[in-house]
Amino acid sequence: MLNDNRVVRPFEWGTEFISSSSNNADPRYLFEEFSRTTIATSDEYFALPANESDVEHELTDRNEQRLSWKSHVKSVSSQNDLVRARVFPFKKNKKSAIVVVPHWNARAGAYFDLCRVLNRVSMTALRLTLPYHEERMPPDLERADHLVAPNVGLTLQSVRQAVIDTRSAVRWLKQQDYEKIGIVGTSIGSCTGFLAFVHDQNIDAAVFNHVSGYFADVVWKGLSTYHVREALEKEISLEELRQYWLPISPMTYMDKLAAQAPRPQRYIYTLYDLTFPIDLSRDTMRELRLRNIKHDEVVLPCGHYTLGEKPWVWIDGYKIVRFCQNHLR
């Protein structure tokens, strides 16, 4: 793996991102309480406000649309708070649309090929730009270091923003009269997509590409986030971090998902993944089975990054597109 401009940033609690009046309280206590109360009221935490942001449209030379709107979550950067998306419309009907949520540090243009393949099989695709990525990245960053950070509170806020931005995209598609909405998320986009899926009944089907139940464990054990762990482990244990980041962990909401009416959901993971280690994926699958949550499972014999290379990217794409075809058309 290339060590491309990864920077070990200082550890920070970031209590200001969860409380406006910490009053010099022990940050561990603040995050324990925040985690407990947020999980109990997660519908409110991930709620989409009733007031809608104005969505601006710009047509590209390929008759695709660039969208932008103001995020419902105010972050540390006004540049980040202007959400960006690209729409690849299927013009013959509005039977189905897919929200595509990319991986961490995805580059401009990533997933455009997938979106155009979805077009070819009669589906509209909306490719979302994650917080602190691409046009949303502040000038002082080279990587999206505020989305997954050694800052406990900032990471919570950033993932919440990603989820609410995703739900905003779903609502916009519903307002355009699409009959069925799906979501395809990869890596951190899988986590974001899962959180949106559990909290938004307007999403009819989902594909989660790379799977883990606990946000903290991926950061702690994954190869891609070694630089984040290096800062975290000086001040905090994995067990503590797992507790504090439960509000943004899919495993937290398994019972909530089990209580809902079944919706088609496919989980894709790889045997030799060093970023989402295989034991984390298997633990998640086990919890789905224990709760009798109907789901589809695909395991590919490659690694995290090789999933984006031939021939695995073709197989992965086929598994994504075919599932969407079967359940959203």
Protein language model features and the residues they cover:
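Short beta-strand element of the alpha/beta-hydrolase
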Residues: R84, K94-H103
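C-terminal catalytic histidine-bearing segment of alpha/beta-hydrolase fold enzymes
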Residues: R282-R329
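Alpha/beta-hydrolase fold nucleophile elbow
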Residues: K174-S187
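A short loop-to-beta-strand scaffold at the N-terminal edge of the catalytic core in hydrolase folds
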Residues: S78-P89
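The feature captures the conserved acid-bearing segment of alpha/beta-hydrolase catalytic domains
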Residues: K221-L280, R286
